[in-house]
Amino acid sequence: MEKFNPGICEIQKAQIVPFGAALDSEQAQDITALVASFTIQQSIDSTAIRGNMFLLDNIGFIERLPLRGEEELLLEIKSFDLGTVRRLKAKIYKIDDVQRSESGNGSTYTLHFISKLSYEANIKYLITSFNNVRGDKAVEKIFDKNYSKITPENEFKKDGQIAQQPYGTRVFKIESEKERLFFIQPTYGNMRLTIPRYSPAEAIAFVANRSFSKDQYLSSTFRFFETWNGFYYVTDEWLNDKAAISKNIPTLNYNTFSSRDPVDAALQISTIQDFRNNRRANVAEDMFSGAYTNTF
């Protein structure tokens, strides 16, 4: 229990693959020992998983490889609460703060990365239009063409049983990363729209701003975001329903202070110390983007 801490995780493995090289080639380099610190961010307000690493390089790795951007980064991360291990395929898109180390015999710098799927999808732009198509169907087509091929699939629990989904949810397997899924909530009504040279993520956000649901509940809070488990095109109400029907989601409690004593392990895992909703409602934005409709 000496390593128990819900707020801490470590990189068990970090491997860089130069642009154009194969994962199993001799060019792939393990940089785990160089990582001094790192952060990873995922949010329902973000279309992609992002992060950065601070490296202490005493072997001249930055010039020996060399690091130029667009390298593939493979991460294996373990948490100090339940020992959960997560793996992420990412792409390096920026290298900055390069300077001489305090010891004078090396350098320090920061690598910025984004999930590989989001990176490769959003280095291009698309101009397209949809006529008499539901919003969720348009999103499915944009994702299938620009992110990865997707096929209908079920979400499975750890015991092998099929996981229950909120009303009407369509679940897809992401073929390029088969362990991940894409969850799409149905929208109401058909739309006509032209996408004017947006990246795929911007295009889906454009559709989201014009989408609303009606069958299960009235809502215009559609979001497109990425997590460890995959991608989501859903409303805030869908997230509430998903939590309510998923028995494997633990009950969490809000408290500004949480004990760090390993004896209080259960309490630490179930405590939220900061909670906020940055996007509750914005009628002006919804009306401007077309997410409102008139009924007579």
PLM region spans:
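Assembly/oligomerization scaffold segments
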Residues: 1-125
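Residue-identity detector for glutamine
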Residues: 12-15, 27-29, 41-42, 99, ...
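Acidic-enriched, low-complexity/disordered segments with a strong bias for Aspartate over Glutamate
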Residues: 5, 24, 30, 45, ...
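A broad structural signal for short, well-ordered beta-strand segments within beta-sheet-rich domains
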Residues: 32-39, 92-95, 189-191, 258-266, ...
